[in-house]
Amino acid sequence: MALPFRKDLGDYKDLDEDELLGKLSESELKQLETVLDDLDPENALLPAGFRQKNQTSKSATGPFDRERLLSYLEKQALEHKDRDDYVPYTGEKKGKIFIPKQKPAQTLTEETISLDPELEEALTSASDTELCDLAAILGMHNLIADTPFCDVLGSSNGVNQERFPNVVKGEKILPVFDEPPNPTNVEESLKRIRENDARLVEVNLNNIKNIPIPTLKDFAKTLEANTHVKHFSLAATRSNDPVAVAFADMLKVNKTLKSLNMESNFITGAGVLALIDALRDNETLMELKIDNQRQQLGTSVELEMAKMLEENTNILKFGYQFTQQGPRTRAANAITKNNDLVRKRRIEGDHQ
């Protein structure tokens, strides 16, 4: 059922507003403007350039001539008499002229230094090279730099071959360039995983922040049927909980992946719990990294991690910094136990 104010609205959709406004007289336009002012007194619906109304309805007296206006203003300025000063200037100078005081010239008097006759004789008979070596030993680098005989090539005390500068300069800082972007082709890698390429064993998507979330989910979906990729890393790719859930579903099916890196992302406790639940039945994954997420995971999540590590004997490396002492100790003991089991299996295999 149509509303009353929309009952006849369809009859006015094809009307031309410009044609209707053109047929209105001046009085009708003013009346329409008054009605619009009542509806929108602040003119909020109009652009800023159309809110100012015409201040006068007078017709122009003539065309605007800029040069004529400038000449008129200049003529008016020249004909206008300057205002007389209230206090006329008489030329009288008040006060005194500042004359700086002359400071007496300081005369430097040389201090007479008396040395022992042996030292006096040794310094008098010393060569330029010996004097340069002596100044270097005493730390008088300014003297060495100012003297013309500071070339100390072949000095016996191992003084540097170069001149000693007057200004101490800091160590030259070597420029540190940014790391190059990740050269991995995302679309090509996804295609090769989907085709189960035997040459593709490791996929590195680290620090590629423009990968869409659906594309990351596609990686998880294609890894379910892949039998060659053993290392997959997507650190710092802005992955969130839906991506973590997709990879958790992949871990329940995949029997080839050995290492998974999901550090430095936006995964919360819910996404981490999904990964932990998937690892309870996974027997192939040996390394998982989930540290440095956007927010702390909490004590309950850390307890679930420790419980999973105690049940899953295949995890040898677990990348997470525990905040609680209890889960940290349990996880460390579980990882140590798992590595000991691998060592025992290797020893038994060597004996057989």
Swiss-Prot record:
One of its GO terms (cellular component) is ruffle. The keyword Phosphoprotein applies. One of its GO terms (biological process) is pointed-end actin filament capping. Ubiquitous. Pfam families: Tropomodulin (PF03250). The keyword Phosphoprotein applies. It is found in: Cytoplasm, Cytoskeleton. The modification Phosphoserine is found at residue 25. Keywords: Actin-binding, Cytoplasm, Cytoskeleton, Phosphoprotein. GO terms for molecular function: actin binding; microtubule minus-end binding; tropomyosin binding. Belongs to the tropomodulin family. Binds to the N-terminus of tropomyosin and to actin. Interacts with FLII. Blocks the elongation and depolymerization of the actin filaments at the pointed end. The Tmod/TM complex contributes to the formation of the short actin protofilament, which in turn defines the geometry of the membrane skeleton. This is Tropomodulin-3. The lineage of its organism: Eukaryota, Metazoa, Chordata, Craniata, Vertebrata.
